[in-house]
Amino acid sequence: MAIHLYKTSTPSTRNGAVDSQAKSNTRNTRKNLIYGQHRCGKGRNARGIITARHRGGGHKRLYRKIDFRRNEKDIYGRIVTIEYDPNRNAYICLIHYGDGEKRYILHPRGAIIGDTIISGTEVPIKMGNALPLTDMPLGTAIHNIEITLGKGGQLARAAGAVAKLIAKEGKSATLKLPSGEVRLISKNCSATVGQVGNTGVNQKSLGRAGSKCWLGKRPVVRGVVMNPVDHPHGGGEGRAPIGRKKPATPWGYPALGRRSRKRNKYSDNLILRRRSK
């Protein structure tokens, strides 16, 4: 990923650092892979109540249908384009398969236009290839990992994400996920070899508030400047302290270090080591 810095003429460009490779493709667009989506609610539930704060507005988006299942088995595909996707931080690749099928997949790091990929059971351990965990050697870097067999990849799909296969025993494989969590997954589940591209996404700087508004992100207001009815930190005369021993969330729970995972989940016995916060 190449970071582009503007010539300093305004504060917006002086503080901004954008991706010079993020370009949309219009020439080879497949209409059957792109469709509109009605983004209703903007952080509201069915009753219109805010359930996810700081969301709203933003530019209209077209959804790209991504092939997370990689179920074109034993058919070679060629990378035709590498495109920007407004719905995720990672880039996507348009793949032309030998049987005429065309699909989008996540862009593996290092993949270029013209490379070939394949998915199946006995395929080479090569970047971009998809195969079951049971056919991979220990230490393989993987992404787009299935949790349920046949459902498609659900883990390690963000830009720069990579997991590691560290053990195989019985019917399960042990993975170290990008969060640091170590958990068990069925060896029959599939994953893609390599790391997700666009690893330098954290180096980007939007530079101004308007750029964040385009992404559908609204301003974040500190609780200490709110009224007591709106936040536990609110109220007081002038610049007053929060009036508590420890910071709290808008709903009164401890703000620092509180575990937010739901209790008694089915996967508790599959997690060998909890993720590090």
Swiss-Prot record:
Signal peptide: none annotated. GO terms for molecular function: rRNA binding; structural constituent of ribosome; transferase activity. GO terms for cellular component: chloroplast; large ribosomal subunit. SMART domains: Ribosomal_L2, Ribosomal_L2_C. It comes from the Eukaryota. InterPro entries: NA-bd_OB-fold, Rib_uL2_dom2, Ribosomal_uL2, Ribosomal_uL2_bac/org-type, Ribosomal_uL2_C, Ribosomal_uL2_CS, Ribosomal_uL2_dom3, Ribosomal_uL2_RNA-bd_dom. Residues 1-31, 227-277 are annotated as: Disordered. Its main location: plastid. It is found in: Plastid, Chloroplast. Pfam families: Ribosomal_L2 (PF00181), Ribosomal_L2_C (PF03947). Keywords: Chloroplast, Plastid, Ribonucleoprotein, Ribosomal protein. One of its GO terms (biological process) is translation. Belongs to the universal ribosomal protein uL2 family. Part of the 50S ribosomal subunit. This is Large ribosomal subunit protein uL2cz/uL2cy. It comes from Manihot esculenta (Cassava).
